[in-house]
Amino acid sequence: MTKKKVVIGMSGGVDSSVAAYLLKEQGYDVIGVTMQIWQEDKEYEEREGGCCSLSAVDDARRVAQKLDIPFYVLNFRDSFKRNVIDYFVDEYIQGRTPNPCIACNKYLKFDELLQKAKGIGADYVATGHYAKIEERDGRFQLIRSKDDRKDQTYALYNLTQEQLEHTLMPCGEFTKDKIREIAKEIGLDVHNKKDSEEICFIPDNNHGRYICEAAPNKVRTGNFVDKYGNVLGKHKGIVYYTIGQRKGLGLALGRPVFVTDINPVTNTVVVGPEEDIFKTDLVCKDINFISIDKLEDPMEVEAKIRYSAKPAKATISPMENGRVKVSFEDKQRAITKGQSVVFYKDDLVVGGGIIESLL
């Protein structure tokens, strides 16, 4: 019997490294691939660059050698720039706060990488994500990982049935601590490599400065205003702010104020008291459902409005033109346009969409 072939995306981190090992142990024919997506400066043009750093490629290659699996570096730079970086910059300029990891998963890892994998005769693509995929009643389900603290299903809600059928996520059955333990046991140097926290193409985490450099003619100073339109001061460009932000506003009003809205048309940033950033209802677009085909009637779920949020009780209701209304039982802090909202039923991911407006 021929072994099933799987292409695993390797970032040089501990999760994808151990995922590659686990798949090999499970009897798969494993091929390691690092997606070359980014270069910080000219040296990456001349040399073999990688996912934000040369060392990531080197780490991944060393792991592949240790596991004795073939390893390739694939160039995804143009696609990454088009689908992730340009999208990220445009969204901020429109006054929204996007999640680039979700775009990267949707367009690169589980679309283009999967197509490339199929092109070389592979049955599956695999990643080091903390999530589980199971077939139940003829439908592939995305299920929260065993490690609640590390669960990454929020960033994976766009997966289609076709993609789920051809995707493996072996880390979903383990806790992060156990994954590190396995890495140490099998002698991988990356066993104590720290988790990446920031956006991979903005290592200093300064989004505003990055967008200014990427689109200097699009970022203009403007006014801070209150909800009645009274001018309270000057801001340095709407891309520097996000809903709920309090620090770094440079306003001395004698009371704490928070960013409550961003208006790209008037180039204003609205600030107000903290209670103004608590809301219960939103509308989302670009919906993808996983556990169901489509939403016919209102459904009670738990929903997350950002990666780090706790799931909160909500009702989702179908609207016109494919949108979904989400009504939370309790007010949520700083619901942010451009972020994703993801729906859960127990451990199952029902689906999700991008927050378009607040009601």
UniProtKB/Swiss-Prot annotation:
Region Interaction with tRNA, residue ranges: 150-152, 306-307
Kindly indicate whether the keyword tRNA-binding belongs to this entry: yes
The UniProt record lists the EC number as 2.8.1.13
Alphabetized UniProt keyword annotations: ATP-binding, Cytoplasm, Disulfide bond, Nucleotide-binding, RNA-binding, Transferase, tRNA processing, tRNA-binding
Q: Which Pfam families match?
A: tRNA_Me_trans (PF03054), tRNA_Me_trans_C (PF20258), tRNA_Me_trans_M (PF20259)
Q: Which residues form a coiled coil?
A: none
Q: Which reaction does it catalyse?
A: S-sulfanyl-L-cysteinyl-[protein] + uridine(34) in tRNA + AH2 + ATP = 2-thiouridine(34) in tRNA + L-cysteinyl-[protein] + A + AMP + diphosphate + H(+)
InterPro entries, alphabetized:
MnmA-like, MnmA-like_C, MnmA-like_central, MnmA-like_central_sf, Rossmann-like_a/b/a_fold
**Catalytic machinery residues:** C104 (nucleophile), C200 (cysteine persulfide intermediate)
Q: Which Cys residues form disulphide pairs?
A: C104-C200
Q: What does this protein do?
A: Catalyzes the 2-thiolation of uridine at the wobble position (U34) of tRNA, leading to the formation of s(2)U34.
What family does the entry list?
Belongs to the MnmA/TRMU family.
NCBIfam families (UniProt xref) = PRK00143.1, trmU
What is the protein name stated in its UniProt record? tRNA-specific 2-thiouridylase MnmA
